[in-house]
């Protein structure tokens, strides 16, 4: 009888080496006021992280905003994120994979603790970088910039600064710009072609504020640098946000000197009124004008333009 063979232990299957997929690269996003040093610090750190770990980070998304746009962005984020963001006071927001990390200090601390990236650049260097960046940022727009210094009952409340889309509406922008400087002197009928000392004569709640009647300030007159009126140049700029600057008219091709600033998106003005600029600084000034008490849309306090002119030339 054959002897029974002892049971041999079953051989172990070869170890299975599972190759895990690589982690997706992180997305860094920096949104901030273009002329703040904290924005420049955050921008530099984000770019340094990408350079130091090219496969761990996507190219950072850098979003420079002018003051008015930054204030609008910050308000939207406060409503969206709530919590501690209600008291957020920095001029920059840093995001990792679309989640708020914090301000420049938070990004700097995270870069050092997690990635061993230490920023030792002096603050004086960042101030110089900020100035250079801001100058180039404005120059690259190829737009003109003007200001209106505002008073309520003769008390100064601040400055409104507008970006003029001279590439889209060159003739309309030139009219507004020259009326800000007063360099055209007087019209044939003796009107001083200057916004200085003119008033805001109308405030439409949730609509717009209106000024620029340089004749008598009643709101029924005005004059352009080209004559009493000039044509509608085009309707390419939409009324899609707060702070849009446009020309008042009495019908097609009747633009003069009167203008309006929207208080919210006003698509019903599209294709009827020529928008040609955007408020970029003066959030608190526009808010104060908006809150002036009125009677039949006429301000009960004197809202005047103490001075006006051109910036960044």
Swiss-Prot record:
Domain (PPIase cyclophilin-type): residue spans on this chain: 147-310
InterPro entries: Cyclophilin-like_dom_sf, Cyclophilin-type_PPIase_dom
PROSITE patterns linked to this entry: CSA_PPIASE_2
GO MF entry, a single one: peptidyl-prolyl cis-trans isomerase activity
Top-rank lineage group of the source organism: Eukaryota
Membership in a protein family: Belongs to the cyclophilin-type PPIase family.
Known function: Probable inactive PPIase with no peptidyl-prolyl cis-trans isomerase activity.
Name of the protein in question: Probable inactive peptidyl-prolyl cis-trans isomerase-like 6
Organism: Mus musculus (Mouse)
Originating gene: Ppil6
């Amino acid at each position: 009888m054959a002897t029974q063979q002892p049971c041999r232990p079953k051989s172990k299957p070869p170890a299975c080496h599972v190759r895990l997929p690589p982690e997706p690269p992180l997305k860094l996003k920096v949104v901030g006021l273009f002329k703040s040093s904290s924005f420049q610090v955050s921008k530099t750190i984000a770019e340094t992280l990408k350079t130091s770990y090219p496969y761990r980070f996507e190219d950072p998304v850098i979003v420079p905003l002018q003051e008015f746009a930054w204030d609008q962005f910050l308000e939207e984020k406060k409503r969206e994120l709530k919590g501690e963001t209600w008291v957020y006071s920095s001029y920059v927001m840093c995001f990792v994979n679309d989640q708020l990390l914090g301000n420049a200090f938070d990004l700097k601390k995270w870069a050092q603790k997690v990635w061993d990236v230490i920023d030792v650049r002096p603050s004086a260097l960042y101030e110089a970088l900020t100035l250079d960046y801001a100058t180039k940022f404005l120059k690259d727009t190829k737009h003109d910039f003007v200001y209106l210094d505002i008073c309520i009952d003769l008390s100064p409340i601040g400055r409104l600064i507008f970006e003029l889309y001279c590439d889209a509406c060159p003739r309309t922008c030139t009219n507004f710009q020259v009326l800000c400087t007063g360099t055209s002197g007087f019209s044939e009928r003796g009107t001083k072609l200057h916004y200085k000392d003119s008033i805001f004569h109308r405030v439409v709640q949730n609509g717009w504020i209106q000024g620029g009647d340089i004749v008598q300030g009643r709101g029924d007159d005005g004059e352009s640098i080209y004559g009493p009126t000039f044509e509608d140049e085009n309707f390419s700029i939409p009324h899609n946000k707060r702070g849009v600057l446009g020309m008042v008219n009495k019908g097609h091709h009747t633009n003069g000197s009167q203008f309006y600033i929207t208080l919210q998106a006003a698509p019903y003005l599209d294709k009827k009124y020529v928008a040609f600029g955007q408020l970029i600084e003066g959030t608190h000034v526009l808010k104060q004008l908006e809150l002036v008490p009125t009677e039949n849309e006429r301000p009960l306090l004197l809202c005047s333009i103490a001075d006006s002119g051109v910036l960044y030339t």
